[in-house]
Amino acid sequence: MNWTELSLKKYNEIKDLYLDPDLSDEDRLLYQIRILFDVDPLKLKTNELRNYIDKMKFLGEKVPKVKLKSTYKLGENVYVLKKDLRNLTVAQWLDFQNFLKDGGGDSDNYANLLSVFFFPKGETEYGENYDIEQVRSDINNYLSIAEAMSISSFFLLYRKISLRLFLLYTKKQILKTPLTKEQKKKVKKEFRKLIIATLFPGD
């Protein structure tokens, strides 16, 4: 097993083990084996246990970046990844912003964030004629953590760059307007607040 085979759901389950201060290292190890390999670790022989531990070594490695694809087969369903933010509807943009405010870029929030951009093959209208909860379930259960991280990073970076360009253009237009020195100072101050609130929601 490796990062490109580990589902988003299982990654979050393992992450939760490390956030639990009451678990001993031994218990954490056994739970990891159960999550990753769907076996009962208490029934394993010692040599089998060692084999599973060896297979978990990838957890100590960095999650690799993977190339984004146009389509993804998740379970029984095929999804098209809509990568161009310029074609987002207002509804998509608002959902994306709200999901960022609610959970940021944390892996627990990836299924929500990415459901904005994953369309069942053949569908063109966001949230219409398909079950968006099914999309989130498929992302959670079948998209690898390596893919989820790479796709999320792409959209978060794309969003920041797009917003910076828009805000810089807006600032330029505002400062072309005849204003007193004090008014310009106030506008610049408010504009800085807008940039921070827009680029870093929830901070």
Please give the residue ranges for each predicted region.
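Charged interaction scaffolds used for protein-protein
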Residues: 1-203
